[in-house]
A protein has these predicted regions:
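Serine-dependent carboxylesterase/thioesterase catalytic core
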Residues: 2-9, 14, 22-36, 40-133
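A conserved mid-domain beta-alpha-beta active-site/ligand-binding segment of alpha/beta enzyme cores
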Residues: 135-137
């Protein structure tokens, strides 16, 4: 079974390398999904993730480990179509409700520039209620 690792906002795949190494040493097959919020919209990232999940699902059982925004991307992508659900979803620090810190950070121009639509979504309560609930063991 493959495990897809998805990093958080303003991070890269490097942030999950030690976890990936540990999982591989434990016998798991891993892949990473990467994105850059400064150059992609949330919707574009979600669509790329949806395609990646379709490919993974076509290869057999899979699981997801997602950090922070990666968990929100996962919820959005899995809700787009009738994908085969992962066996397990582990969300590490995913803000499944509006994080107060995002409201303060959004006032700062560098944060707005660096996080784009992804950062803006974190300041909008309607964004969180619009995300589909997902059920996975």
């Amino acid at each position: 079974m493959k495990i897809l690792l998805i990093h958080g906002l303003s991070r890269t795949s490097l942030s999950l390398l030690s976890l990936e190494w540990y999982l591989q040493q434990s016998g798991w097959v891993t892949e990473q999904f990467s994105y850059l919020a400064v150059s992609e919209t949330f919707d574009c990232i979600v669509e790329r993730l949806r395609v990646r999940l379709q490919i993974l699902a076509s290869q057999g059982a899979y699981s997801i480990v997602a950090h922070s925004l990666g968990g929100l991307l996962t919820r959005a992508a899995l809700g787009l179509s009738s994908l085969e659900m992962p066996r397990h979803i582990v969300m590490l620090g995913t803000p499944n409700q509006l994080p107060r810190l995002a409201l303060h950070a959004w006032r700062l121009a560098p944060f707005r520039w660096w996080t784009g639509q992804c950062g803006l979504n974190l300041t909008n309560p309607d964004f969180f209620t619009s995300l589909p609930n997902i059920e996975s063991p």
